[in-house]
Amino acid sequence: MFRKTDTNEQLDIFSSPSTYMKGRAAKKYEDPHAWHNEFYQYVTSKIDEETFRPLFKEGNMGAPNASIRILVAMSILKEGFGCSDEDLFEKCEFDLLARKALGMGTLEDAAPSIDTYYLFRRRICDYEKEKCVNLMEKCFGQVTGEQVKVFKISGRSVRMDSKQIGSNIAWYSRYEIVHATLRKEMNEFTLPSLNPSLRKKVEEALTEDAQKTVYRTDSDTMAVRFQELGQLIYSILVRLKWDETHLLHRVFHEQYNVEHGKAIAKDKKDIKASSVQNPNDPDAGYRSKNGKKNKGYNTNLTETTDEEDKPSLIVGVQVESATAADNSFVEDAIKKAEEVTGNKVTTLYSDGAYQSPSNRKFAETEQIKFVANGIQGKRSRFDLTDLLSKHQVLDRNTGELIDAVLTKGGKWKVKLSEGKTRLRYFAQEVIDRFLTRMQIEATPLEERNKRNNVEASIFQYCFHTRNNKTRYRGLLKTKLFSYCRCMWMNMRRIQLFEITMCQRA
């Protein structure tokens, strides 16, 4: 049965740690601007436990057996310190500052058990799988919304940036991906369902060390082995009649085609970036950005721009597979920011990756000033400023003005005096892109650089990652990490802001 935490507990002065502390220690422990007191004031005490009511069935006595507020705050504290679960529970038991931050102000308060903590996080993930609603995201929005109200942050101007972040998985070759999936799916429950001859082949395949096979085998032999492994898996799928709900079925059809009952390996170029990169994390995608390869996820952060005498807070967090383009986040990010702040966004600062025709149309429809510090693609050789008015194009290389003619297909055509390709065509899309670039370049540099501040948020977001990898596997766990990490970042910003304001005073 759902049960709220009692917020009106009677405090025993003899159980408070500060009673046994001397001057300096007691002063620091009770300092309202110390991180532990700021955390309790602006995070722990702001958590609305009603958000998590759906996780607990009515009539189920004994559940939850710990404060939901403390369980959520523990997750935030963990990502704030970047510590392991073991270190987290050690802090909850013996670190007086961490206990104070969680609301355990007396020595008699007991920390939740590790089983309760894990069960709570698993329930959040299971609920999202079933209902497609992330309760930790709702909690993030609710807590941040409370902070926005306290500091009267308008949120009318926001900036956003994204970060490719890796999943905690090994990098596998195609052969290793298929072999590891076979090993994962074939167990004591599925093997008995195979006929004796097929079972023997599978058992032989499972004894192989795929990593050593790839390392020791030449490419031609490897291609043959990859083909044979695919044929074996095809026989398993036919025998067990497995459909797309099974991971082995998905991996097989991502890596092979079937022609006349035979498994034919797909060409490397035909493998999609959204295909399984490692069976231990089927949600992770592949992307190469600015020469850096990533197998994992793409996180987008939206934050308020600096307002005078007000902190800048993260008001939106989105996590998708690494294949998600930056410009796909914009509309949803704006809507979430408006829900948190309660105000309409009027100005958006971003980089060129967020530019797209649909986003520009969205900004125009919603009357949002879209300020980007660039646009993807190199600068055109041709200046199209006078194309529509004077029907002329300026060749920047030669300085020549060239007359343009409108074709029946709706494109503008110009004829060059030299070069292999004398005719050039300009569609409306190209013209719109040119005008957008000109508009961006005309924006004052100071205005465009407002977006750069969000890069500090990106740095802090992945501060505790190793080799740009989180500790987690799976989209749902990566989401939990992201929401908790950003709630911690907001708390630290508030703390630094209040310290700065006190120093000014």
Task: Give residue ranges: language-model regions.
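Charged, often Cys/His-bearing segments associated with DNA-binding zinc-finger transcription factors
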Residues: 1-45, 417, 431-432, 500-501, ...
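Basic, short loop/linker segments at the boundary and entry of helix-turn-helix/winged-helix-like folds
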Residues: 30-73
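Generic, well-ordered alpha-helical segments
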Residues: 44, 65-69, 80, 93, ...
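Short linear capping/connector segments at secondary-structure termini
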Residues: 57-58, 103-105
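Short, solvent-exposed segments of well-ordered alpha helices
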Residues: 61-65, 79, 288, 478
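General structural concept
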Residues: 70, 96-101
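Alpha-helical support elements that line or immediately flank enzyme active sites
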Residues: 72-82
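Anion-binding and metal-coordination hotspots
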Residues: 84-87, 92, 106, 110, ...
